[in-house]
Amino acid sequence: MAFQCQRDCYMQEFDSCVVSCVPAELKLENNGRKEKLTGFNVKLKDTILFPEGGGQPDDHGTIGGVPVLRVLRQGPDAVHFVSSALEEGQEVHIKLDWERRFDHMQQHSGQHLITALADTMFGYKTTSWDLGRQRSSIELDTATVKPGEMEALETAVNEKIRAHVPVTVNLLSIDDPAVEKVRSRGLPDDHAGPIRIIDIEGVDANMCCGTHVSNLSHLQVIKILGTEKGKKNKTNLIFIAGNRVLKYAEKSYNIEKSLTVLLKTGADEHVDAVDKLQKTVKRLQKSNLTILREMAVLIAQNFKSKPDRGHFFSLHNKDGDNEFMNIVANEIGFQDTLIFMTVGDEKGAGLFLIAGPENIVTEVGPRVSELLQGKGAGKAGRYQGKANSLVKRAEVEALLKERSYKCTAGDE
């Protein structure tokens, strides 16, 4: 069965009828967090909302004013997930999120065009593709591409766009001999009905369920951003098409303007300016590390030179690191001195180190880790780790100081 969205990819509003509405759950991932939503699966007599398939994401839109959160294909049906129930038999008005749909059409038709010409020009077969949110990728069945090939391919695809090549949809029966001549990666196991062929006149005929432009001129332009190493003996071609190219150009220009202000150089000198800055930063970091190490030694020597230094040492250094803390601890020696050190933001996250008599460190380590909302581990008289909050540093210091006094009193 072909849906209305496949018969007319440019239709943005449509009236249909609710065939069924049943309670359902939808699992979503929002900013890396998994969510489970309760709602309803709705089947319509027909739909202009494309169900996910053929490498193309589903459409967004509304049914009777109710937002559609997901559209999936189940056999010959499109299942729309909505948050509110709709009555069976109810006549409903469907509105399509056209900006999202047209973007998908541009990327998908762009993929067909690139796939066809990469094959005819260089013999590179497409094994899979991915329509991403910001850029798309085509997996080519080749370990490497030769210099100049992607530039030639980009020129060729944009020549076809400027030539206003028509794109048509043909429906063939599964036993039609013409089916054997089209590009295909196979049909879903639950496919029913005629075979849908996307025909780019004189360029390609490809079996596909997705939504496509009616003329290559609607792609506007294709930019091949480059290639990346893919799976074994594969190469990923990265591209953007249509409005994404305009957004990419706008974003790139805004970044260029900002860098010009920050670097105080023209765009042609940005790379050299950043290279010089990186070398300067690397040199300063090396110098800073040397100073920090020397300071650690001096801090330890200063503590050891005090006749009344006692058996407890505590220090916080905002700019230190694990190496800094360990240098101080090693210089002081922790066989008979309990050492507590932290680095980082005093009211935020950081690192901590406890060093001293092994029995004491083993006893207090987990408690210190708990107070600093962190995680640590230790052995041989050291316990160190990451602190998610150093707010209770003073409380930890008091705890360790008291423990060191008890130990000293016990020894005496």
From Swiss-Prot:
This is Alanyl-tRNA editing protein Aarsd1. SUPFAM superfamilies: ThrRS/AlaRS common domain, Translation proteins. One of its GO terms (molecular function) is ATP binding. Zn(2+) binds at residues 108, 112, 208, 212. One of its GO terms (biological process) is regulation of translational fidelity. Gene3D superfamilies: 2.40.30.130, Threonyl-trna Synthetase, Chain A, domain 2 (3.30.980.10). GO terms for cellular component: cytoplasm. Its cofactor is Zn(2+). Pfam families: tRNA_SAD. SMART domains: tRNA_SAD. Keywords: Cytoplasm, Metal-binding, Protein biosynthesis, Zinc. Its main location: cytoplasm. It comes from the Eukaryota. It is found in: Cytoplasm. Binds 1 zinc ion per subunit.
